[in-house]
């Protein structure tokens, strides 16, 4: 099963919820050319792990592990039986700490794979309700939408009929830590009401219109704090690249 990456075309921070989590308004688009892959494979006879992930990257504290534990509360017997014979193979292609939602997409694909393999018969809303307990971007990947306006803490998804130009991607070898970038944003001067007003305009426009008519700093509130924390990102800000998420992946319209 393929776990596709996403890009944020705009990302405006508009306040905090009761937990002090950031509220956002954003346009997410699915990137069908950038994906991880998940599959069930036969378990090695000498493996002693109850749930084993075989991967080309370090999996400790992985969000998939958390999804497994959450599902185990309701489907412990089914999961134990399956993973007594199978391991989960995860092939990572999506850059890590790059603003492309790789971990969230992997988690969504794992939930979908378990729903299908074990015939759990969970509908989309039930899957989204589970995902809210795991992470903020997972709901978009569960939806299957190619483009959506996303709000709240990432759990409110509205499909958007979009016009998406070809994008040319650059993946700097810089690991941008999401929490650190958000914390840097919080140290600055911001106007949540202004951000929300801008977002209400942006969410009505196509991706093509947004990238043609607005500056990179206008579209993504995290670009300036990202460049402050990671000075090598400043050149991309100055050269009119657009930033996805909290970085470090950047893009331009491929003209």
UniProtKB/Swiss-Prot annotation:
**UniProtKB keywords:** ATP-binding, Isoprene biosynthesis, Kinase, Nucleotide-binding, Transferase
- Annotated residues that bind ATP are located at 95-105
Give the catalysed reaction(s), semicolon-separated.
4-CDP-2-C-methyl-D-erythritol + ATP = 4-CDP-2-C-methyl-D-erythritol 2-phosphate + ADP + H(+)
User: Which residues constitute the catalytic centre?
Assistant: 6, 137
This entry's Enzyme Commission designation comes to 2.7.1.148
Q: Where are the transmembrane segments?
A: none
Q: Enzyme class, one word?
A: transferase
Q: Which domain of life is it from?
A: Bacteria
What GO biological process, any one, is recorded here? isopentenyl diphosphate biosynthetic process, methylerythritol 4-phosphate pathway
Q: What pathway is this protein said to act in by its record?
A: Isoprenoid biosynthesis; isopentenyl diphosphate biosynthesis via DXP pathway; isopentenyl diphosphate from 1-deoxy-D-xylulose 5-phosphate: step 3/6
What SUPFAM superfamilies does this protein's entry cite?
Answer: GHMP Kinase, C-terminal domain (SSF55060), Ribosomal protein S5 domain 2-like (SSF54211)
Q: Which GO terms describe its molecular function?
A: 4-(cytidine 5'-diphospho)-2-C-methyl-D-erythritol kinase activity; ATP binding
* Functional description taken from the UniProt entry: Catalyzes the phosphorylation of the position 2 hydroxy group of 4-diphosphocytidyl-2C-methyl-D-erythritol.
Similarity field: Belongs to the GHMP kinase family. IspE subfamily.
The record's section on NCBIfam families has:
ispE, PRK04181.1
Protein name in the entry: 4-diphosphocytidyl-2-C-methyl-D-erythritol kinase
